[in-house]
Design a protein with these regions (language model features):
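Short, flexible/disordered secondary-structure transition segments
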Residues: 33-44, 99, 123-127, 137-145
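Activation segment signature within eukaryotic-like protein kinase domains
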Residues: 21-22
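Conserved structural core of kinase catalytic domains
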Residues: 1-16
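Regulatory extensions appended to serine/threonine kinase catalytic cores
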Residues: 141-252
Length: 252
């Protein structure tokens, strides 16, 4: 499976396969845990084997019942996930020409994981936040996140949190003039069409509103784009990294 991931990435085909498969790996670990087992050695490459195109985990070590407290059990499960992600982090770094930095979305994902690890989150929360990261989502899931964050931007209970994040985090500095003439002129025609349909300022709030509307137009009016993958690719090209930065600032 991981070989597929890299082949797909390198050939720039089927990015979707790439992302879902990584998510499946994390889900698979959750299934081991739900059976009352833990692995205990996922930091070591000797516990993985490739069979065909699939990466299999071998040498599952033990039973969570060996531990006396819930806290120990939770820590053990969490350690499995961090070990798996640590292994993948090293692996991506070594296999991608130029390292992870050459694949911005991948870099964002591992930065997120490393930040989440420092926050002492419960196992369930940690696993969910990691598995729901935009890097692991398909096009529709990624674009739907803009809808969710724009909803939070307007909802009374979350408005303040979103406003503070968007205005105070330096992560958004790069997006403050997202609507420059050169960007707008370079956009694919369906993106420009949605842009010209309303008045948008160069503020980050309006960028979020625009992306929400892009998703809305696709679903409500059948956009000229053809598929959500094409919409997602356009967004990833012209407004690269914005979704990942939103996720980082609004999810933890
Ligand atoms: C954009 O704003 C201008 C000035 O406020 C207004 O005249 C125009 O009708 C607006 N356009 C749209 C598409 O809302
Ligand atoms: C970008 O937004 C600013 C307002 O913040 C507006 O004056 C400008 O015309 C917009 N640029 C384009 C290319 O639409």
């Amino acid at each position: 499976m991981l070989i597929m991931i890299i082949l797909n990435y390198l050939s720039k085909l089927g990015m979707i396969v790439v992302l879902t498969n990584l998510g499946e790996l994390i889900d698979g670990l959750g299934r081991i845990h739900s059976k009352g087992l833990y692995h205990g050695g996922l930091g070591s490459e000797s516990n993985y084997v490739f069979i065909g195109e699939c990466l299999k985990v071998i040498n599952i070590k033990g039973d969570l019942d060996e531990f006396n407290t819930d806290e120990d059990r939770e820590n053990k499960k969490k350690e499995d996930i961090t070990d798996l992600l640590g292994m993948l982090d090293n692996w991506f770094e070594s296999i991608l020409a130029g390292g992870k930095r050459s694949w911005l979305e991948c870099q964002h994902f591992f930065d997120f994981v490393n930040r989440a690890k420092t926050l002492n989150l419960d196992y369930d929360v940690f696993a969910k936040k990691v598995a729901c990261h935009p890097f692991l989502l398909e096009a529709d899931g990624r674009m739907s996140l803009f809808v969710e964050y724009d909803r939070r931007r307007n909802a009374p209970t979350t408005r303040q949190q979103v406003a503070v994040a968007l205005t105070s985090s330096s992560d958004f500095a790069n997006f403050k003039s997202w609507n420059s003439t050169s960007t707008v002129n370079n956009m694919d025609s369906y993106m420009r069409g949605v842009y010209n349909h309303r008045n948008y300022s160069g503020d980050v709030e309006d960028l979020l509103r625009y992306l929400r509307n892009l998703h809305h137009h696709y679903h409500e009016h059948g956009l000229a784009a053809g598929s959500m993958e094409i919409v997602d690719r356009g967004v990833t090209t012209y407004i690269r990294g914005f979704l990942e930065v939103l996720y980082k600032n609004l999810e933890i």
